[in-house]
Amino acid sequence: MQSSPLLENLMEALRVLPGVGPKSAQRMAYHLLQRNRSGGVNLAKALSEAMTHIGHCKSCRTFTEEDECAICQNYRRQISGQLCVVEMPADIQAIEQTGQFSGRYFVLMGHLSPLDGIGPREIGLDLLQKRLEEESFQEVILATNPTIEGDATANYIAEMCSIHNIKVTRIAHGIPVGSELEMVDGTSLSHSFVGRRDISL
């Protein structure tokens, strides 16, 4: 049995989402058509408006509808002297939820990966260099992912910062809270020893 062209187009469109294969796309399409047509209409409207109006903050490159995001416009953030470099906009949300950081951000939109043709310009390091030259930062916190590519990216940025005599720190990686040592992989355990800190009494 051949599906209608519109149904095929809907399922194909849903497959652009990460982790959505043919079966999942079919299930979603059938659900919207059978049980939630109003939800489908709202989804289409929200997608259309987001694609049209959401761009990148001119300062930190996160997603926003304004020229500058709310964090970059916040005066208290501006005078903190701290800049946190992350790979993706979702990383900002994760850090903000901790309540431990009150500075500004710079979003790379990825990490260095020469084999994939992703070099410094592709992740905006030229724009980061410009910010380091034009603004006064006392500390740059590198919050890239604890991967080979993330570490390479962090090292590259650390060298950039050294030229400007800016303090550079890297977020600690290691043992997750609540885990047992025997269940932790060797790499994480090694990082936890290297990144150990003093206990204040």
Swiss-Prot record:
A zinc finger (C4-type) spans 57-72. Pfam families: RecR_C, RecR_HhH, RecR_ZnF, Toprim_4. The keyword Zinc applies. GO terms for molecular function: DNA binding; zinc ion binding. Residues 81-176 form the Toprim domain. One of its GO terms (biological process) is DNA recombination. InterPro entries: DNA_Rcmb_RecR (IPR000093), Rcmb_RecR (IPR023627), Rcmb_RecR_Znf (IPR015967), TOPRIM_dom (IPR006171), TOPRIM_RecR (IPR034137). Keywords: DNA damage, DNA recombination, DNA repair, Metal-binding, Zinc, Zinc-finger. CDD domains: TOPRIM_recR. Belongs to the RecR family. PANTHER family: RECOMBINATION PROTEIN RECR (PTHR30446:SF0). May play a role in DNA repair. It seems to be involved in an RecBC-independent recombinational process of DNA repair. It may act with RecF and RecO. This is Recombination protein RecR. The gene is recR.
